[in-house]
């Protein structure tokens, strides 16, 4: 079953290899290219606000580890996925499920190479083993889970894939860290009381707040996070946010002033053209009325 997944994504891995080899060096900052094009006259003038925004992006990129850009992060993610796919082909997922999750063979099934379709994980082992996984092991499971498509028949999905996906969605993992998974009702179960049975024709009303569970404060860790959210941002984040708002306001005011000055210049030039055209029109109107003076010997003709 695993070999079928890998065969379907063979073309995708080739495209990832092409993307990785397409660019090995980071391109110059966009703001520098825009200034260079403007100086050479190869492009139109860029608005000051756009230059400020791109400059801020270049400044923030210098504080990232090793100066990585978004393109570098995408290439790194592609490389990690390719490594995980290679590990899946080598059978590391089956070894992980057998040794760390305590997976067992399903009766009346046959083992087919590195496939995991003949395995089943005991429910209690999932909760214990998932918290002891390393980063590489979690990446391996995430890549394996992403190989399935929504159009796939539910019967063709391996049982271990169903178990892992159920735990990732509803187990004590990620946002549900600290929620009870086995043995009792989870703490974030919305309805705290059992609804009564209604007769035909009776009206169904909305439950009051005391009959539902507040999922924001159902466990101590969530309650602490909720109280921290209500207090607001920390001073450092607040300063950065206000600084960004101030820069945006300054850039907007500069653009508005520049646009208003250009409009005023156009109006003044139009007014000047109108003033210069009016005397010329007056001279053209009065020119046919005035007569040229005659010489003394031409008076006898009149």
Swiss-Prot record:
Residues 20-44, 264-290 are annotated as: Disordered. The keyword Membrane applies. One of its GO terms (cellular component) is mitochondrial membrane. Coiled coil: none annotated. It comes from the Eukaryota. It is a single-pass membrane protein. Residues 277-290 have a biased composition (Polar residues). The chain crosses the membrane at residues 236-253. Keywords: Membrane, Mitochondrion, Transit peptide, Transmembrane, Transmembrane helix. Belongs to the GEP7 family. This is Genetic interactor of prohibitin 7, mitochondrial. The lineage of its organism: Eukaryota, Fungi, Dikarya, Ascomycota, Saccharomycotina. The gene is GEP7.
């Amino acid at each position: 079953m695993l070999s079928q997944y890998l065969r379907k994504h063979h073309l995708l891995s080739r495209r990832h290899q092409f993307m990785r080899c397409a660019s090995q060096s980071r391109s110059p900052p966009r703001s520098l290219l825009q200034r260079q094009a403007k100086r050479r006259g190869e492009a139109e003038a860029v608005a000051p606000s756009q230059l400020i925004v791109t400059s801020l992006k270049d400044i923030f990129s210098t504080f990232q580890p090793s100066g990585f850009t978004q393109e570098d992060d995408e290439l790194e993610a592609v490389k990690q996925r390719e490594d995980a796919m290679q590990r899946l082909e080598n059978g590391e997922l089956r070894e992980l499920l057998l040794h760390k999750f305590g997976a067992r063979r399903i009766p009346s099934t046959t083992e087919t190479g590195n496939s995991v379709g003949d395995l089943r994980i005991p429910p209690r082992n999932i909760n214990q083993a998932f918290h002891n996984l390393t980063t590489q092991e979690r990446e391996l499971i995430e890549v394996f889970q992403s190989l399935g498509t929504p159009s796939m028949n539910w019967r063709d999905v391996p049982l271990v894939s169903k178990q892992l996906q159920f735990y990732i969605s509803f187990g004590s993992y990620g946002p549900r860290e600290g929620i009870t998974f086995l043995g009792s009702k989870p703490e974030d179960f919305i309805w705290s009381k059992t609804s009564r049975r209604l007769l035909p024709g009776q009206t169904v009303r909305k439950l009051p707040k005391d009959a539902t569970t507040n999922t924001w404060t159902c466990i101590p860790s969530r309650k602490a996070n909720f109280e921290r959210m209500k207090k607001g941002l920390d001073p450092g984040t607040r300063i950065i946010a206000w600084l960004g708002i101030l820069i945006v306001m300054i850039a907007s005011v500069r653009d508005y002033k520049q646009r208003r000055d250009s409009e005023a210049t156009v109006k003044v030039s139009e007014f000047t053209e109108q003033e210069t055209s009016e005397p010329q029109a007056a001279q053209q109107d009065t020119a046919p009325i005035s007569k040229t003076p005659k010489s003394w010997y031409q008076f006898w003709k009149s």
